[in-house]
């Protein structure tokens, strides 16, 4: 076979393999997020380690670590806001409700290798704190768009962590 035919054959084969390459694992998780698929992709695409995850365990670990980081950042933001706006509902969000968010993500991370069902449950339960914060603020007639956006993001990240850990085999 002459070099040009060999080059053409190799090019054709590589194009076939590239076109058959499956999407990244995080994209599969985001597809499962249904109507929130686009937001899921937007949140995760900028996380290079998550985008390069090679298997479901690695993906789950990276997603839950990311969730824990974002939950902690959100709680710290709320604690800072509490200093300038001491409303009881904001205090409850910053402490009680977001203690639950951070604690559930931390628990999920700790259970990944030993009890995937509990890790999955905890990832989902983390979103409850953000939801409860929204309810507490609404009852107190407090409308702070930054907190609403924060809660919305944490609920989405909780859903993403739930969907990622749901891919793990039961142990």
Model-predicted segments: where are they?
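Terminal membrane/secretory targeting segments in land-plant proteins
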Residues: 1-25
């Amino acid at each position: 076979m002459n070099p040009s035919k060999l080059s053409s054959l190799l090019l054709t084969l590589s194009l076939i393999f590239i076109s058959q390459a499956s999407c990244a694992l995080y994209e599969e998780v985001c597809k499962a997020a249904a109507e929130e698929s686009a937001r899921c992709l937007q949140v995760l695409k900028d996380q290079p380690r998550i985008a390069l995850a090679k298997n479901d365990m690695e993906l789950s670990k990276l997603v839950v670590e990311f969730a824990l980081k974002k939950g902690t950042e959100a709680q710290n933001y709320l604690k800072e806001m509490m200093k300038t706006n001491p409303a009881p509902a904001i205090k409850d969000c910053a402490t009680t409700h977001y203690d639950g968010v951070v604690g559930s993500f931390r628990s999920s991370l700790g259970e990944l290798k030993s009890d995937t069902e509990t890790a999955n449950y905890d990832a989902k339960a983390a979103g409850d704190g953000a939801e409860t914060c929204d309810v507490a603020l609404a009852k107190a007639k407090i409308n702070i768009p930054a907190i609403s956006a924060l809660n919305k993001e944490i609920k989405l990240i909780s859903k993403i962590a739930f969907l990622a850990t749901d891919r793990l085999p039961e142990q």
